Regions:
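Noncatalytic carbohydrate-binding groove/subsite architecture in carbohydrate-active enzymes
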Residues: 2-3, 13, 38-200
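Acidic, Ser/Thr/Pro-rich beta/coil linker or hinge segments at domain junctions
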Residues: 301-339
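Extracellular/periplasmic catalytic domains that process cell-envelope and extracellular macromolecules
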Residues: 7-10, 16, 54-56, 110-115, ...
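Catalytic cores of eukaryotic secretory-pathway lumenal/extracellular enzymes that build
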Residues: 25-35, 75
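Extended hydrophobic-aromatic, low-complexity segments
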Residues: 178, 190-191, 248, 278-281, ...
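Carbohydrate-binding surface patches
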Residues: 260-303, 340
Length: 340
Protein backbone atom coordinates (compact mmCIF):
# COMPACT_ATOMS: atom_id res chain seq x y z
CA UNK A 1 0.00 0.00 0.00
CA UNK A 2 2.88 2.36 0.76
CA UNK A 3 4.52 1.85 -2.63
CA UNK A 4 1.34 1.47 -4.68
CA UNK A 5 0.37 -1.34 -7.00
CA UNK A 6 2.26 -2.65 -10.02
CA UNK A 7 0.81 0.01 -12.31
CA UNK A 8 2.57 2.83 -10.41
CA UNK A 9 6.16 3.99 -10.81
CA UNK A 10 7.00 2.92 -7.26
CA UNK A 11 5.12 -0.37 -7.13
CA UNK A 12 6.59 -3.84 -7.50
CA UNK A 13 5.84 -4.96 -11.04
CA UNK A 14 6.65 -8.63 -10.61
CA UNK A 15 7.13 -11.35 -8.01
CA UNK A 16 9.08 -14.58 -8.31
CA UNK A 17 7.77 -17.79 -6.76
CA UNK A 18 11.01 -18.38 -4.86
CA UNK A 19 14.16 -19.58 -6.65
CA UNK A 20 15.33 -22.93 -8.07
CA UNK A 21 12.96 -25.04 -5.96
CA UNK A 22 14.35 -28.45 -6.89
CA UNK A 23 17.63 -27.41 -5.24
CA UNK A 24 16.08 -26.37 -1.92
CA UNK A 25 17.41 -29.49 -0.21
CA UNK A 26 20.94 -28.35 -1.14
CA UNK A 27 20.74 -24.57 -0.96
CA UNK A 28 18.40 -24.45 2.07
CA UNK A 29 19.00 -27.85 3.61
CA UNK A 30 18.24 -26.74 7.18
CA UNK A 31 14.84 -25.39 6.18
CA UNK A 32 14.05 -27.95 3.48
CA UNK A 33 16.14 -31.12 3.89
CA UNK A 34 14.11 -33.20 1.42
CA UNK A 35 13.69 -32.70 -2.30
CA UNK A 36 10.58 -30.75 -3.18
CA UNK A 37 7.70 -32.92 -4.35
CA UNK A 38 5.51 -32.23 -7.32
CA UNK A 39 2.48 -31.70 -5.10
CA UNK A 40 4.38 -29.27 -2.86
CA UNK A 41 5.75 -27.25 -5.75
CA UNK A 42 2.38 -26.83 -7.43
CA UNK A 43 0.40 -26.14 -4.26
CA UNK A 44 2.90 -23.59 -2.95
CA UNK A 45 3.04 -21.90 -6.36
CA UNK A 46 -0.74 -21.53 -6.36
CA UNK A 47 -0.96 -20.45 -2.71
CA UNK A 48 1.72 -17.76 -2.93
CA UNK A 49 0.54 -16.44 -6.29
CA UNK A 50 -3.05 -16.17 -5.09
CA UNK A 51 -1.89 -14.25 -2.01
CA UNK A 52 0.04 -11.75 -4.13
CA UNK A 53 -2.81 -11.31 -6.61
CA UNK A 54 -5.24 -10.66 -3.75
CA UNK A 55 -3.07 -7.72 -2.69
CA UNK A 56 -2.04 -6.52 -6.16
CA UNK A 57 -3.98 -7.95 -9.08
CA UNK A 58 -1.79 -6.04 -11.58
CA UNK A 59 1.47 -7.67 -10.46
CA UNK A 60 3.09 -10.28 -12.70
CA UNK A 61 3.93 -13.66 -11.22
CA UNK A 62 7.14 -15.39 -12.36
CA UNK A 63 7.68 -19.07 -11.71
CA UNK A 64 8.85 -21.69 -11.06
CA UNK A 65 12.42 -20.35 -11.58
CA UNK A 66 13.89 -23.74 -12.44
CA UNK A 67 17.69 -23.90 -12.51
CA UNK A 68 17.84 -25.27 -16.04
CA UNK A 69 16.66 -27.94 -18.44
CA UNK A 70 16.54 -31.00 -16.16
CA UNK A 71 13.80 -29.74 -13.81
CA UNK A 72 11.74 -28.85 -16.87
CA UNK A 73 12.03 -32.49 -17.92
CA UNK A 74 11.44 -34.39 -14.68
CA UNK A 75 10.61 -31.83 -11.99
CA UNK A 76 13.57 -32.83 -9.84
CA UNK A 77 17.33 -32.63 -9.64
CA UNK A 78 18.56 -35.98 -8.34
CA UNK A 79 18.72 -39.09 -10.53
CA UNK A 80 17.58 -41.29 -7.64
CA UNK A 81 14.65 -39.12 -6.58
CA UNK A 82 11.24 -40.53 -7.41
CA UNK A 83 8.09 -38.46 -6.99
CA UNK A 84 4.99 -40.69 -6.97
CA UNK A 85 2.72 -37.76 -7.91
CA UNK A 86 4.71 -37.04 -11.07
CA UNK A 87 5.27 -40.69 -11.92
CA UNK A 88 1.52 -41.27 -11.88
CA UNK A 89 0.88 -38.75 -14.66
CA UNK A 90 4.13 -38.28 -16.57
CA UNK A 91 3.15 -40.69 -19.35
CA UNK A 92 0.57 -38.09 -20.43
CA UNK A 93 3.16 -35.38 -21.04
CA UNK A 94 6.36 -34.83 -22.99
CA UNK A 95 8.10 -33.30 -19.98
CA UNK A 96 7.35 -31.93 -16.54
CA UNK A 97 6.94 -28.39 -17.81
CA UNK A 98 3.73 -29.41 -19.62
CA UNK A 99 2.26 -30.72 -16.39
CA UNK A 100 3.22 -27.62 -14.39
CA UNK A 101 1.63 -25.36 -16.99
CA UNK A 102 -1.51 -27.51 -16.98
CA UNK A 103 -1.78 -27.23 -13.21
CA UNK A 104 -1.38 -23.46 -13.27
CA UNK A 105 -3.97 -23.14 -16.03
CA UNK A 106 -6.44 -25.22 -14.01
CA UNK A 107 -5.69 -23.03 -11.00
CA UNK A 108 -6.68 -19.97 -13.02
CA UNK A 109 -10.01 -21.59 -13.84
CA UNK A 110 -10.55 -22.39 -10.17
CA UNK A 111 -9.52 -19.01 -8.75
CA UNK A 112 -10.88 -16.88 -11.58
CA UNK A 113 -7.57 -15.14 -12.25
CA UNK A 114 -4.25 -15.98 -13.86
CA UNK A 115 -1.75 -17.16 -11.24
CA UNK A 116 1.25 -17.60 -13.56
CA UNK A 117 2.04 -14.71 -15.87
CA UNK A 118 5.60 -15.63 -16.83
CA UNK A 119 7.21 -19.07 -17.02
CA UNK A 120 10.68 -18.51 -15.63
CA UNK A 121 13.69 -20.75 -16.13
CA UNK A 122 17.46 -20.30 -15.81
CA UNK A 123 19.90 -21.30 -18.52
CA UNK A 124 23.65 -21.84 -18.44
CA UNK A 125 25.52 -23.22 -21.44
CA UNK A 126 26.92 -26.70 -20.82
CA UNK A 127 29.25 -26.68 -23.83
CA UNK A 128 31.33 -23.55 -23.21
CA UNK A 129 34.89 -24.59 -22.38
CA UNK A 130 36.45 -23.32 -25.62
CA UNK A 131 36.07 -20.31 -27.89
CA UNK A 132 34.78 -22.59 -30.65
CA UNK A 133 32.06 -23.97 -28.38
CA UNK A 134 31.02 -20.54 -27.09
CA UNK A 135 30.69 -19.23 -30.64
CA UNK A 136 28.01 -21.87 -31.29
CA UNK A 137 26.40 -22.02 -27.83
CA UNK A 138 23.43 -19.76 -28.56
CA UNK A 139 22.29 -22.04 -31.36
CA UNK A 140 21.05 -24.50 -28.71
CA UNK A 141 18.36 -21.94 -27.94
CA UNK A 142 16.81 -21.57 -31.38
CA UNK A 143 18.51 -23.53 -34.19
CA UNK A 144 16.77 -26.88 -34.91
CA UNK A 145 19.73 -28.09 -36.97
CA UNK A 146 22.32 -27.71 -34.24
CA UNK A 147 23.50 -30.40 -31.81
CA UNK A 148 25.74 -29.17 -29.02
CA UNK A 149 28.66 -31.25 -27.76
CA UNK A 150 27.55 -31.52 -24.14
CA UNK A 151 26.44 -34.19 -21.67
CA UNK A 152 22.84 -33.08 -22.24
CA UNK A 153 22.67 -33.83 -25.96
CA UNK A 154 22.88 -37.67 -25.90
CA UNK A 155 20.19 -38.00 -23.23
CA UNK A 156 17.96 -34.98 -23.73
CA UNK A 157 18.52 -33.93 -27.33
CA UNK A 158 14.79 -33.91 -28.03
CA UNK A 159 14.42 -30.85 -25.79
CA UNK A 160 16.60 -28.70 -28.05
CA UNK A 161 16.37 -26.02 -29.30
CA UNK A 162 15.45 -25.11 -25.75
CA UNK A 163 13.54 -21.86 -26.23
CA UNK A 164 11.58 -23.31 -29.12
CA UNK A 165 10.52 -26.30 -27.03
CA UNK A 166 9.55 -24.07 -24.10
CA UNK A 167 7.38 -21.87 -26.30
CA UNK A 168 5.73 -24.89 -27.92
CA UNK A 169 4.72 -26.14 -24.47
CA UNK A 170 3.36 -22.75 -23.49
CA UNK A 171 1.33 -22.50 -26.69
CA UNK A 172 -0.18 -25.93 -26.12
CA UNK A 173 -0.74 -26.05 -22.37
CA UNK A 174 -1.11 -22.45 -21.18
CA UNK A 175 -1.35 -19.96 -24.07
CA UNK A 176 -0.67 -16.36 -23.17
CA UNK A 177 2.00 -17.20 -20.61
CA UNK A 178 5.16 -15.19 -21.19
CA UNK A 179 8.67 -16.64 -21.15
CA UNK A 180 11.62 -15.36 -19.10
CA UNK A 181 15.19 -16.38 -18.37
CA UNK A 182 15.87 -14.58 -15.11
CA UNK A 183 19.36 -16.04 -15.02
CA UNK A 184 21.37 -16.81 -18.13
CA UNK A 185 24.98 -17.04 -19.22
CA UNK A 186 26.26 -18.79 -22.33
CA UNK A 187 29.90 -18.02 -21.69
CA UNK A 188 32.41 -19.65 -19.40
CA UNK A 189 31.10 -18.21 -16.13
CA UNK A 190 33.86 -19.78 -14.05
CA UNK A 191 36.49 -18.00 -16.14
CA UNK A 192 34.70 -14.76 -17.00
CA UNK A 193 37.59 -12.51 -15.89
CA UNK A 194 39.43 -13.83 -18.95
CA UNK A 195 36.70 -14.71 -21.43
CA UNK A 196 34.74 -11.51 -20.75
CA UNK A 197 37.64 -9.53 -22.17
CA UNK A 198 37.63 -11.46 -25.44
CA UNK A 199 35.56 -10.55 -28.48
CA UNK A 200 34.17 -14.10 -28.55
CA UNK A 201 32.04 -13.21 -25.53
CA UNK A 202 30.53 -10.33 -27.52
CA UNK A 203 29.56 -12.65 -30.36
CA UNK A 204 28.07 -15.17 -27.93
CA UNK A 205 26.00 -12.52 -26.17
CA UNK A 206 24.95 -10.89 -29.45
CA UNK A 207 23.56 -14.14 -30.83
CA UNK A 208 21.98 -14.99 -27.48
CA UNK A 209 20.06 -11.71 -27.38
CA UNK A 210 19.06 -12.21 -31.00
CA UNK A 211 17.77 -15.68 -30.13
CA UNK A 212 15.72 -14.16 -27.31
CA UNK A 213 14.14 -11.75 -29.79
CA UNK A 214 13.60 -14.51 -32.34
CA UNK A 215 11.90 -16.77 -29.79
CA UNK A 216 9.78 -14.08 -28.12
CA UNK A 217 11.47 -14.00 -24.71
CA UNK A 218 9.73 -11.43 -22.52
CA UNK A 219 12.50 -10.80 -19.98
CA UNK A 220 16.10 -11.95 -19.59
CA UNK A 221 18.67 -11.22 -16.89
CA UNK A 222 22.37 -11.77 -17.44
CA UNK A 223 24.08 -13.63 -14.58
CA UNK A 224 27.69 -12.63 -14.15
CA UNK A 225 29.96 -9.75 -13.23
CA UNK A 226 29.52 -7.27 -16.06
CA UNK A 227 32.33 -5.07 -14.75
CA UNK A 228 34.65 -7.96 -15.66
CA UNK A 229 33.09 -8.41 -19.11
CA UNK A 230 33.40 -5.27 -21.26
CA UNK A 231 32.69 -7.20 -24.45
CA UNK A 232 29.43 -8.54 -23.04
CA UNK A 233 28.41 -5.01 -22.05
CA UNK A 234 29.10 -3.78 -25.57
CA UNK A 235 27.09 -6.65 -27.04
CA UNK A 236 24.14 -5.60 -24.90
CA UNK A 237 24.66 -2.00 -26.01
CA UNK A 238 24.51 -3.07 -29.65
CA UNK A 239 20.85 -3.74 -28.97
CA UNK A 240 20.13 -0.95 -26.50
CA UNK A 241 22.48 2.00 -27.14
CA UNK A 242 24.79 1.35 -30.07
CA UNK A 243 25.56 5.03 -30.84
CA UNK A 244 25.88 6.22 -27.25
CA UNK A 245 22.80 8.38 -27.72
CA UNK A 246 20.09 5.82 -27.06
CA UNK A 247 19.73 4.32 -30.54
CA UNK A 248 18.60 0.72 -30.26
CA UNK A 249 17.57 -2.41 -32.09
CA UNK A 250 13.95 -2.12 -33.18
CA UNK A 251 10.94 -3.46 -31.33
CA UNK A 252 9.57 -5.38 -34.32
CA UNK A 253 11.54 -8.35 -35.62
CA UNK A 254 11.97 -8.72 -39.38
CA UNK A 255 12.41 -12.17 -40.88
CA UNK A 256 16.08 -12.79 -41.59
CA UNK A 257 18.18 -15.78 -42.50
CA UNK A 258 21.86 -16.65 -42.44
CA UNK A 259 23.15 -19.05 -45.08
CA UNK A 260 25.26 -20.79 -42.43
CA UNK A 261 24.71 -20.21 -38.71
CA UNK A 262 28.00 -21.89 -37.89
CA UNK A 263 29.74 -18.97 -39.61
CA UNK A 264 27.44 -16.02 -39.04
CA UNK A 265 24.23 -15.12 -37.23
CA UNK A 266 21.84 -12.39 -38.37
CA UNK A 267 18.86 -10.63 -36.80
CA UNK A 268 16.95 -7.68 -38.24
CA UNK A 269 14.31 -5.27 -36.99
CA UNK A 270 12.29 -2.13 -37.55
CA UNK A 271 10.69 0.29 -35.11
CA UNK A 272 6.99 -0.47 -34.90
CA UNK A 273 5.54 -0.19 -38.38
CA UNK A 274 8.18 2.31 -39.54
CA UNK A 275 10.07 0.61 -42.36
CA UNK A 276 12.22 3.61 -43.26
CA UNK A 277 15.16 2.17 -41.31
CA UNK A 278 16.15 -1.47 -40.93
CA UNK A 279 18.55 -2.36 -38.13
CA UNK A 280 20.54 -5.54 -38.58
CA UNK A 281 22.89 -7.34 -36.19
CA UNK A 282 25.51 -9.58 -37.82
CA UNK A 283 28.35 -11.68 -36.46
CA UNK A 284 31.41 -13.21 -38.06
CA UNK A 285 32.45 -16.33 -36.16
CA UNK A 286 35.62 -16.95 -38.14
CA UNK A 287 38.94 -16.57 -36.33
CA UNK A 288 40.89 -16.21 -39.57
CA UNK A 289 38.76 -14.91 -42.44
CA UNK A 290 37.04 -11.65 -43.20
CA UNK A 291 33.45 -12.40 -44.16
CA UNK A 292 31.74 -10.27 -46.78
CA UNK A 293 28.09 -10.21 -45.83
CA UNK A 294 25.59 -9.31 -48.52
CA UNK A 295 22.43 -7.95 -46.93
CA UNK A 296 19.48 -8.04 -49.30
CA UNK A 297 16.18 -6.48 -48.24
CA UNK A 298 13.54 -8.41 -50.14
CA UNK A 299 9.85 -7.64 -50.19
CA UNK A 300 10.13 -3.98 -49.19
CA UNK A 301 8.51 -1.15 -51.11
CA UNK A 302 11.13 1.22 -49.69
CA UNK A 303 14.25 2.15 -51.60
CA UNK A 304 17.14 2.30 -49.15
CA UNK A 305 20.00 4.65 -50.08
CA UNK A 306 22.50 4.55 -47.22
CA UNK A 307 23.94 2.41 -44.45
CA UNK A 308 26.03 2.94 -41.33
CA UNK A 309 28.02 0.03 -39.91
CA UNK A 310 28.82 -0.14 -36.20
CA UNK A 311 31.14 -2.87 -34.94
CA UNK A 312 32.86 -4.49 -31.99
CA UNK A 313 36.24 -6.00 -32.85
CA UNK A 314 39.06 -7.82 -31.08
CA UNK A 315 41.01 -4.55 -31.06
CA UNK A 316 38.54 -2.84 -28.74
CA UNK A 317 35.31 -3.57 -26.90
CA UNK A 318 34.11 -0.07 -27.80
CA UNK A 319 31.38 0.12 -30.43
CA UNK A 320 32.76 2.09 -33.38
CA UNK A 321 31.58 3.18 -36.81
CA UNK A 322 33.68 1.23 -39.33
CA UNK A 323 31.83 2.08 -42.53
CA UNK A 324 29.40 4.62 -43.97
CA UNK A 325 27.79 3.87 -47.33
CA UNK A 326 25.83 6.54 -49.20
CA UNK A 327 25.55 4.70 -52.51
CA UNK A 328 23.30 1.77 -51.65
CA UNK A 329 21.34 0.44 -54.64
CA UNK A 330 18.80 -2.30 -55.25
CA UNK A 331 18.26 -2.55 -51.48
CA UNK A 332 21.50 -4.48 -51.15
CA UNK A 333 24.41 -3.71 -48.84
CA UNK A 334 27.79 -5.42 -48.64
CA UNK A 335 29.53 -5.34 -45.29
CA UNK A 336 33.02 -6.58 -44.49
CA UNK A 337 33.10 -8.34 -41.14
CA UNK A 338 36.63 -8.69 -39.74
CA UNK A 339 37.73 -12.01 -38.21
CA UNK A 340 38.05 -12.49 -34.47
Amino acid sequence: QTLGDASTSTGMQGYSLDNEPVLWNDTHSLLHPNEVSNQELVSKSIELSAAVKDVDSKAEIFGPAFWGMLPCINGSDGENYTDPDWNAVKSQYTWYMDYYLTQMKEAEQQYGKRLLDVFDVHYYAQDCATDAARLQAARSLYDPDYQENSWLQPYFGQYFPFLTRLQESIDQYYPGTKLALTEYNLGDLSNEKTTGKNVVSALTETETLGAFADQGVYLATYWGTLSECPYVVSAINLYTNYDGKGASFGDTLVESKSEDLSKAAVFASIDGSDTSTVKTVLSNKSTTDTQVATITLDGSSNEYKSAVVYAITQDSSDIKVIDVQNDVSNNQVKVELPPL
